[in-house]
């Protein structure tokens, strides 16, 4: 096999593998960005960069929309059919449309500001392994505290605007590698007293705009500079991410029906310590 073909097939293999990693870790509170940084390092692969990582998140975004398609359809229909300007939102689904919008504002605004005023952010020390390790440990401790002090008695109908504003601000912290978007939003929701499975579903739903927009922006930027043959591995990564995301969403929701999140606390502590002591 010619060397160029062999190299290209290996790039496609890496895209499939990293797509699986992305999809599986995007919805668990363990940070997909951190794993997409650490795993290539362990295998001696080149860091594929922020654009690749953000682009393959599109597979995860499509997976959320597909998995929750019935709920999302209900949310949209409720918003446009039951909203009365004089009375406000009548039911939880129409309010949830507003909540998703509100929770998305901080991360989109801060993300845009970073894009405009910190062009070298992707090469900063914040994306280094040491920063990721420390962040992983800190986020593990916060998740543990949310399990200890969160009352976990709120369902969707009980969620209010204050809960969502706090969750949206927390989600903006996910711009820093190692934080975990699903992890920090789940932690915020638990601190607000939201029941675990409801907290996870809310975390997934509010992530749709941010993950989708981020992925589309980076993918379009790659389309402008890469050839079709170079784009194919990214598309493969997106598809791989989609299927592993579906599996991860279903697995995590079933897990939270009967368990707490402490196993992820232990994992993140071990992950952070492993990076500090090994890499």
From Swiss-Prot:
Enzyme category, top tier: hydrolase
Membrane-related topology note: Multi-pass membrane protein
EC assignment: 3.6.1.27
Family annotation (InterPro entries): UppP
Compartments, as annotated in UniProt: Cell inner membrane
GO cellular component: plasma membrane
Single Gene Ontology MF annotation: undecaprenyl-diphosphatase activity
Chief location bin: membrane
Keywords for the protein's UniProt record, in alphabetical order: Antibiotic resistance, Cell inner membrane, Cell membrane, Cell shape, Cell wall biogenesis/degradation, Hydrolase, Membrane, Peptidoglycan synthesis, Transmembrane, Transmembrane helix
Recorded catalytic activity of this chain's protein: di-trans,octa-cis-undecaprenyl diphosphate + H2O = di-trans,octa-cis-undecaprenyl phosphate + phosphate + H(+)
Parts of the chain that traverse the membrane: 10-30, 48-68, 96-116, 128-148, 203-223, 229-249, 259-279
Pfam families assigned: BacA (PF02673)
Swiss-Prot/TrEMBL GO biological process terms: cell wall organization; peptidoglycan biosynthetic process; regulation of cell shape; response to antibiotic
Organism superkingdom: Bacteria
Function: Catalyzes the dephosphorylation of undecaprenyl diphosphate (UPP). Confers resistance to bacitracin.
Further remarks about this protein from its record: Bacitracin is thought to be involved in the inhibition of peptidoglycan synthesis by sequestering undecaprenyl diphosphate, thereby reducing the pool of lipid carrier available.
Family in the record: Belongs to the UppP family.
Name listed for the protein in its UniProt record: Undecaprenyl-diphosphatase
